[in-house]
Design a protein with these regions (language model features):
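Short, structured segments at the rim of ligand-binding sites
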Residues: 1-435
Length: 435
């Protein structure tokens, strides 16, 4: 396992550009399975989760051509149905959570799919009920094969349906949309997730000939079509990387320009950092974080302690709560971080406490952070990354701590952040990878 060795306490400077959005990439890559024609995707990030999904798609019989850095052409003319039933396919699906979104496209295209329970981050339970119930609503059936440890879906003639989702699941909504675009009749999805990633998926599908209306709202209407054709698509900048860079600049007291952030699609993210006292200036589609030696957490109007909580879009993405928590350790004031959507994402805070942070872990979902106001710096520490977002939060903490820290299991960080050490070193960080 590779390790990051971080020499903390260095100021950042200059500018950095975010990669293409990881979560969007996983969705649109699955969508290429819906047509026999060529789909070209631009701005794909060079990260483990995306590269592994591309490799798996190629193994399924899809012709994959790399046209330039971040630009790929996919042609799913002849899918290898034998491979889709193989142990190798099931094993790879099990290791890659994004592959859950194969269910909708393959069911729509082939009328059947065998699928292993997916892996991914160990951040608590992430139910598949929304995905499965959506397929059932469209007329599919499924059963669990105890010998294969996999689910078998059948749905030769999917038909449109009205459905009210029990949760606004992002990947669940994506799966149902992709199954619905080739179904007979009209599908209505109420309480649909409406993240920018979903909006981008719908834009791609519409460019391929789908008929999806209500994009950007939680009420989607999909008129089924006979077939889809090729298209071109460009990914949004990764909002999680943008938030991570804001956090790095703030906690190190650095001035940093983050270029081409897709500001309109950041939603509430900039305001969440502003509530921690961080100044964020907007210059066109760039944001500038001025150097701040001190930043003060706001309180509610009645004087009570600020609560920062995740919520379905347009609420705050859960993927940035770990970053906000670390940034708050050096703010002036107190904040309650409430992780509502996952129950294990705050367990990394014990490592921050070892570094000198004042954090009270109330339960698996809530932590109170009492900021040091930079009066006491975090101490270096040796840590292990349990998941992508905790890993980047640990890296941010290590960058602010005077001295040398180590983070093991950094393949978790590589899953979501492209060439992160070289990009950060280019703006003043001191990070070394040891194999």
């Amino acid at each position: 396992m590779a390790t990051f060795v971080i020499e903390g306490g260095h100021k950042l400077h200059g500018s950095i550009t975010p990669q293409g959005a990881k979560n969007e990439a996983l969705q649109v890559l699955c969508a290429v399975l819906l047509t026999k024609e060529t789909v070209v995707i631009n701005n794909l990030p060079d990260i483990l989760d995306v590269n592994n999904l591309i490799d798996l798609i190629a193994s399924m019989g899809v012709t994959v051509e790399k046209l330039a850095k971040g630009k790929y052409a996919f042609t799913a003319r002849n899918l290898d149905t034998a491979y889709l039933r193989s142990a190798d396919f099931l094993k790879k699906c099990n290791k890659l959570r994004g592959s859950v979104m194969f269910i909708g496209p393959l069911l729509a295209r082939l009328g059947e799919v065998t699928y292993a329970k997916p892996g991914g981050d160990k951040i608590g339970r992430r139910r598949l009920d929304t995905h499965f119930q959506g397929m059932v609503n469209l007329g599919a059936s499924f059963e669990y094969d105890h010998d294969l440890l996999a689910y078998r879906f059948e749905g030769k003639h999917l038909k449109g349906s009205y459905m009210l989702l029990d949760e606004a699941s992002v990947t669940g909504t994506a799966n149902i949309i992709m199954a619905s675009v080739l179904a007979e009749g009209t599908t209505t999805i109420y309480n649909a997730a409406c993240e920018p990633y979903l909006q981008q998926l719908c834009k791609l599908l519409n460019a391929m000939g789908a008929k999806i209306s209500g994009v950007g709202s939680n009420l989607l209407t999909i008129e089924g079509v006979k077939e889809l054709h090729g298209a071109q698509h460009t990914l949004l900048p990764d909002m999680i990387e943008v938030g991570s860079f804001i956090g790095m600049a703030a906690i190190t007291g650095s001035e940093l320009r983050i270029r081409n952030v897709g500001y309109r699609d950041l939603g509430i993210i900039p305001d969440a950092f502003r509530r921690l006292g961080i100044r964020i200036d907007v210059d066109g589609d760039d944001i500038i974080i001025p150097a701040q030696e001190h930043y003060q957490i706001e309180s509610f109007l009645d004087g009570s302690i600020l609560t920062v909580a995740d919520a379905p879009w347009p609420g705050l993405t859960p993927d940035l709560l770990s970053v906000l928590l670390v940034v708050a350790t050096q703010a002036k004031g107190t904040v309650l971080i409430h992780q509502k959507m996952f129950e294990s994402r705050l367990f990394f805070v014990d490592k921050l406490i070892d570094m000198g942070a004042q954090i009270i872990l109330c339960d698996p979902h809530r932590a109170v952070v009492v900021g040091h106001d930079h009066q006491r710096q975090l101490k270096p520490n040796n840590m292990t990354s349990p998941d992508i977002r905790a890993g980047i939060a640990m890296l941010i903490a290590a960058m602010s701590a005077e001295g040398t820290s180590k983070i093991d299991h950094i393949d978790q960080i590589d899953r979501g952040y492209e060439d992160i050490e070289h990009r950060l070193n280019a703006i003043g960080a001191k990070i070394r990878r040891e194999e």
